[in-house]
């Protein structure tokens, strides 16, 4: 990333078996901004992704949090582009797309996800965001703390993105 401000990369390993720890430690040898955290042996009422996100947010040293997923590719200017919107809102929703291949399922997934992103974009333009994707969103740590994190939605398997966005809207016009 070519962002010039304070930045850290927190990688949370949610019990993967793919050598994530070794990969991140190799990155850390070249760039001290990389941090490795693991949910192994972590006691929490949260499950899966929300448990991992909660750990990373707790350990984050900066106010603004920016999220993507391990299977996503971001451009070199991703942090710069998202941070341009920080002066306008405490919660920034980025658009994403699914990389498609020639299979029918892939094409269908791409269309389905594109429709979600179009709906999300439209609702944002009407100052009433309804949905977002956890693979491209950013919000302030203080907002997360103000809504008591994911605790209200801890029983849901998902919800770290759109449902969490709706929780945040209850306390602040985003």
What is each residue range found by the language model?
Residues 65:
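Short aromatic/hydrophobic "clamp" motif used to bind/position activated sugar donors
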Residues 14-17, 72-74, 98, 137:
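Acidic metal-phosphate-binding loop of nucleotide-sugar-dependent transferases
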Residues 162-174:
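Catalytic donor-sugar/metal-binding loop of nucleotide-sugar-dependent glycosyltransferases
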């Amino acid at each position: 990333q070519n962002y010039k401000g304070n930045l850290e990369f927190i990688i949370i390993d949610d019990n993967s078996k793919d050598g994530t720890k070794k990969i991140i430690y190799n990155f850390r040898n070249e760039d001290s901004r990389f941090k490795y955290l693991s949910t192994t042996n972590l006691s929490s009422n949260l499950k899966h992704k929300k448990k991992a996100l909660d750990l990373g947010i707790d350990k984050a040293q900066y106010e603004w949090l920016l999220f993507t997923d391990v299977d996503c590719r971001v451009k070199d200017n991703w942090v710069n582009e998202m941070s341009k919107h920080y002066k306008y809102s405490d919660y920034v929703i980025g658009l994403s797309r699914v990389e498609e291949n020639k299979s029918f399922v892939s094409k269908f997934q791409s269309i389905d996800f594109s429709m979600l992103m179009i709906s999300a974009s439209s609702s944002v333009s009407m100052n009433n965001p309804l949905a977002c994707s956890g693979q491209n969103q950013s919000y302030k740590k203080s907002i997360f703390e103000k809504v008591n994190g994911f605790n209200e939605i801890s029983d849901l398997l998902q919800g770290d993105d759109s449902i969490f966005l709706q929780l945040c809207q209850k306390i602040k016009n985003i």
